[in-house]
Amino acid sequence: MEESQSKQESNTRVAQHGSQQDVDPTFQTKRALEKERSKPRPRPLPRVQLQSLPGWSSTSKDVPLSQLIREMDHESRRCIHRSKKKLDRSEHISQGTIPEIYEKRKETISHTQSMEQKYLFQNFTKLLLLQKCCPGGSEKLVRESWHPCVPEEGGHMIEIQDLFDPNLDTEKKPQLVIIEGAAGIGKSTLARQVKRAWDEGQLYRDRFQHVFFFSCRELAQCKQLSLAELIAQGQEVPTAPTRQILSRPEKLLFILDGIDEPAWVLEDQNPELCVHWSQAQPVHTLLGSLLGKSILPEASLMLTARTTALQKLVPSLGQPHRVEVLGFSEFERKDYFYKYFAKERNTIIDFNLIGSIPVLLTLCEVPWVCWLLCTCLEKQMQQGEVLSLTSQTTTALCLKYLSLTIPGQHLSTQLRTLCSLAAEGICQRRTLFSKSDLCKQGLAEDAIATFLKIGVLQRQPSSLSYSFAHLCLQEFFAAMSYILEDSEEAHGDMGNDRTVETLVERYGRQNLFEAPTVRFLLGLLNTREMREMENIFACKFPWETKLKLLQSIIGEPFCQPCHLGLFHCLYENQEEELLTETMLCFPLTASGPNHMEATVFQTNVKRLVIQTDMELMVVTFCITFSHVRSLRLKGKGQQEYKLTAPAMVLYRWTPISEASWKVLFSNLKCTRNLEELDLSGNPLSYSAVRSLCTALRQPGCRLKTLWLVDCGLTSRCCSFLASMLSAHSRLAELDLRLNDLGDNGVRQLCEGLRNPACNLSILRLDQASLSEQVITELRALETKNPKLFISSTWMSHMTMPTENTDGEESLTSSKQQQQQSGDKHMEPLGTDDDFWGPSGPVSTEVVDRERNLYRVRLPMAGSYHCPSTGLHFVVTRAVTIEIGFCAWSQFLHETPLQHSHMVAGPLFDIKAEHGAVTAVCLPHFVSLQEGKVDSSLFHVAHFQDHGMVLETPARVEPHFAVLENPSFSPMGVLLRMIPAVGHFIPITSITLIYYRLYLEDITFHLYLVPNDCTIRKAIDEEELKFQFVRINKPPPVDALYVGSRYIVSSSKEVEILPKELELCYRSPRESQLFSEIYVGNIGSGINLQLTDKKYMNLIWEALLKPGDLRPALPRMASAPKDAPALLHFVDQHREQLVARVTSVDPLLDKLHGLVLSEEDYETVRAEATNQDKMRKLFRGSRSWSWDCKDHFYQALKETHPHLIMDLLEKSGGVSVRL
């Protein structure tokens, strides 16, 4: 059984596990916390690369993996049950000190109040899921080569609730979903989550009445089963008679986990020969009939299998939904780390122990490896060792696990026997073993007990059988068995040949390098790992065996296709001699016209689809040993240069993590033949640019050309680029176009260009946005250095590849491409509520006005900023983002942080497709200009189901904090308070002025509040209830201080109550402080002022003129009879809208269903001209409510932004907030 550990997504999910194979950290329940507090605390351990809190015990016993898993399943179910109930807040407070989990960059604080369930699927272990887009018309999964979809059909990321969504092409709901992926990646975990979620009523209840889960390796133990017996095995508790269950087959879901594990052939039978559902038949025949739709053709199925096993599974599987599990994102790897060690509540390990080693962090993308690494650290803690892991491969990590787990060399003989058992099981495709199997192999009773205790073996609770803790662990032991056998063989060549024959027979030559056993075997043939094996088994291995076995497995290098499996094997081996010999012998042409291996060779350009950080790491590692001169990591929508052959193009449809960037750039430190690197179209963070420039400064880096077009670079990145240019870098050509460098950034580049050590000869920049002074400076540089050419136009040799009929790459000029695509550079005028991005403004949709929920659909990769909210997103692809306005009081109340931290910005509940957002800028209102606030005091608070997490932002700017590679939950900026400073924190504040006309009298309301969009919106809505309209006036220029008081005064005799305002923070749900000002006659105008009460200096002044008092969009409440009628915006401008709206049909589409019925919609559309349509629409609007007119205004704003802005400006510039 291939099962993996999955960790909880920290923004919205709590891990659920119920399998013998699930490997997940234990979660603390309330009862466990009470029990933990009652324990006495021993003295702390010495601090050696380990941050220990008082109370950590080094005497904790080894817990078998099976026991740990059962405990985790119990705790996970309690977490699910607990999430459905609202805990009593006072009960938590009465328990005393709230336990805390610390790491260097994050702090987790258990809840002191219940967290409401934000959405249905928050309790799931978070795994990255890629739904593949298979070639149209394909009716079989079997292909000449088994590879993810071709580059043009990359697929898209989905969530667990989307597994059975309709196909985008056919709109049909799938009956067959295949969950595929690499070994240990989390396929079985996902399958069990689906079953568990259905049991809990959280998933697919509207589609399936019965869901049955089957472990295929356990089913394979049965000789024969009837359909009725199969259904009975798939239910923990019988829910209905079999006849009743089978009466509605379209409401049934069968989950077959690990269908590729048993050594069976699933053959469909003749439908005419199908037996009755109560009659037994061979299990493989029964399952084959289910898959072939000979029985229950209307039922749905979900299969899990390794990707490489699918082509030989069955002859045909129709057109399934194929979903690939890609493992953990970088954030979830970190989250898993401290969740794992949460079971030792008083122990915390600095995550930098792992995070500072990017290779280790990348390996942890695979959940099983993540568990393995944490287990090694835990064993080191228990044995009192210094915590340190230097493993660069999964093989090395497995050996480390073995050396820490096996108690001494006295078990070496039994360990050999266990390896033989593993190899025999792999060859026979067996993962379950009886007690007699173990004894026949030569395992003693005490050895079996020891292996069970340390967690290498586990006993199956449903039978008397045994298995390895994970299938990957069995494959690792099998690999060791082949090393041990060959070392004992008298005739080494014969032993090598037999080993290779066995592996080819088991996996096939085509998939040989995809098999984990082969990868482990190559890893064990590394010199360092063989020495480690010698220590474990207390023996010596002849080095001749190693070399001959390597040659036997790899074969002739020039006969091997260049694909991911071989790259993985070479990476595991790490031997420079083998890498060089193999990589330099690769052919540069395709082996045939139909050859679509993981790479496609075309005109000396290798193409490779990579989906994960692990794949990117192994490929770039191997490339450095090859003839490849040019490397392109293809970003979406990028324009491209012609690469110098031989070249390789990597296609990647999922986000690249920070750790992966570090590994990639680390591999560039010694590039051998690589001279060109194109990263255009890939968003690069500040830290990624720093890693890149560090690599370019290394003497072994031979890169001469670097393209960074449209990579989201800012002026902050230019300091690294300038330093790199000044450090004797070999770089001769640098392209930085389509980046927001600004004058400051370009000036920093100029400093690097002036350095005599700079070898750059071509620099491409966007100069249109630069000031004349900076452009002059650039021209002066060119004049001073004749070898330097600075350009801002695309060079003639820059081309974009297209496919011709022969499948070869043809080159099209960018000018021709632009002519074909037409003029797409018209930028529509937008408003402050829109998100401004590469293509202009993107409208924000109102999802639920009462709940303050909004949605924006960002159309392409790039950077987007909303002036109204201050939010800023950097996205890698088109994505829909939902934004909710929250109140801190709902989450922060009564936590310890309310005394140690202050709110520093608005709180948002953001939801977005996982991995699509590489950075988010969260606004704050703390003033940094005076240098009185240390930016290290800023934290971003995430409110999650298991508590609140404080994360340190990547950087803090004057108006926002930047969080890179974020996961989303209710989140906002907090500032840690320093006792000596108290509450005297400089604040960026705003003044809000509202007025209402009543006959000739005017009432003003004046607010002084922090610059928080959620507070502003709450005040807008409150004032709107009483027909008050806001006037836009400039805010105070200087920073103000929380707790300070200010005197309100006027240039005329008016009544002001109260006459003092205090600047304070109040949650949006609380009443805000304001002064009410009564004016009998405004005359020519009135001057309002705010003066600091303590120092008597003027901090704000505004002139209110009669022209400011033009009504716009007040909500019509029960106005007095004598009050002037305040018309809605659309009614005020009816004549202009009828005359100037030029595109009515898109407007009607937005109103359809919200305001217009189907009949109204068709009636308006039937009119002949746009003006007649608008008149008809206005005639119907007489019966509309104010909310309907609000929808009308919003639709006009989205379809005709120029017109609406023009009307707003002519009406006096009164702010409109809907």
From Swiss-Prot:
The UniProt record lists the keyword ATP-binding: yes
Compositional bias segments (type: Polar residues): 7-29, 799-815
Principal subcellular localisation of the protein: cytoplasm
Residues the UniProt record annotates as site (Cleavage): F968, S969
Pfam families: CARD, FIIND, LRR_6, NACHT, NLRC4_HD2, NOD2_WH, UPA-FIIND
Start and end residues of each stretch annotated as ZU5: 835-968
LRR repeats: 343-364, 673-693, 730-750
Record-annotated NACHT domain positions: 175-484
Any one GO BP annotation for this protein: activation of innate immune response
Region (UPA): 969-1118
GO molecular function, one term: ATP binding
Residues flagged as site, Trigger for autolytic processing: H942
A Gene Ontology term for the protein's cellular component: neuronal cell body
Domain FIIND positions: 835-1118
Region (Disordered): 1-61, 799-842
Record keywords: ATP-binding, Cytoplasm, Hydrolase, Immunity, Inflammasome, Inflammatory response, Innate immunity, Leucine-rich repeat, Necrosis, Nucleotide-binding, Nucleus, Protease, Repeat, Ubl conjugation
Entry's free-text remark on domains: The leucine-rich repeat (LRR) domain may be involved in autoinhibition in the absence of activating signal, possibly through intramolecular interaction with the NACHT domain.
Similarity comment: family membership: Belongs to the NLRP family.
Function of the protein: Acts as the sensor component of the Nlrp1a inflammasome, which mediates inflammasome activation in response to various pathogen-associated signals, leading to subsequent pyroptosis. Inflammasomes are supramolecular complexes that assemble in the cytosol in response to pathogens and other damage-associated signals and play critical roles in innate immunity and inflammation.
Subunit structure: Interacts (via LRR repeats) with BCL2 and BCL2L1 (via the loop between motifs BH4 and BH3). Interacts with NOD2; this interaction is enhanced in the presence of muramyl dipeptide (MDP) and increases IL1B release. Interacts with EIF2AK2/PKR; this interaction requires EIF2AK2 activity, is accompanied by EIF2AK2 autophosphorylation and promotes inflammasome assembly in response to danger-associated signals. Interacts with MEFV; this interaction targets Nlrp1a to degradation by autophagy, hence preventing excessive IL1B- and IL18-mediated inflammation.
Protein name according to UniProt: NACHT, LRR and PYD domains-containing protein 1 allele 2
